[in-house]
């Protein structure tokens, strides 16, 4: 019986430790290298060219963070290239509303894949800026916030 309890405790601790790394971050610069491993000596896998792009941090090792994007592409990025998350991606077409209610005046149609800058979130709504538009979107079908 004690063995079963110990196994359960180890399992619970491993889940809580791994989920502690899982936070959303954003790109600090317009050009950021994604590497195969957590080292500047590691080969560049690809390059992001979009400031504020939201990414999910899934692991960390010294000064590198392992990330995935909303399309599930992943690799390692140096922490100097990352900042606290300030954006989301629309994963489906969405309506931008003037106020945080579906009965509010629609302002614009946000297309799938559009980068949205987060202003604040309240319950199931987030206030965002997209180009010249500012308004509210429902939190379903957006990727990049905790």
Question: Which residues fall in each region the model found?
Answer:
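Sec-dependent signal peptide recognition
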Residues: 2-10
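Second-shell loop/turn segments in exported
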Residues: 38-42
């Amino acid at each position: 019986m004690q063995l079963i309890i110990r196994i359960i405790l180890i399992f619970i601790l491993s889940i809580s430790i791994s989920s502690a790394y899982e936070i959303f971050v954003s790109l600090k610069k317009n050009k950021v290298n994604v590497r195969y491993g957590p080292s500047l000596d590691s080969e560049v896998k690809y390059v992001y060219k979009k400031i504020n792009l939201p990414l999910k941090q899934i692991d960390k090792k010294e000064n590198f963070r392992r990330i995935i994007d909303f399309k599930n592409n992943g690799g390692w990025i140096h922490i100097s290239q990352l900042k606290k998350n300030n954006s989301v991606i629309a994963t489906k077409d969405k309506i931008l509303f003037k106020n945080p209610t579906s009965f509010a005046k629609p302002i614009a149609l946000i297309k799938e894949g559009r980068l949205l800058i987060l202003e604040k979130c309240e319950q199931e709504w987030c206030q965002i800026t997209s180009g010249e538009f500012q308004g509210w979107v429902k939190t379903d079908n957006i990727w990049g916030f905790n």
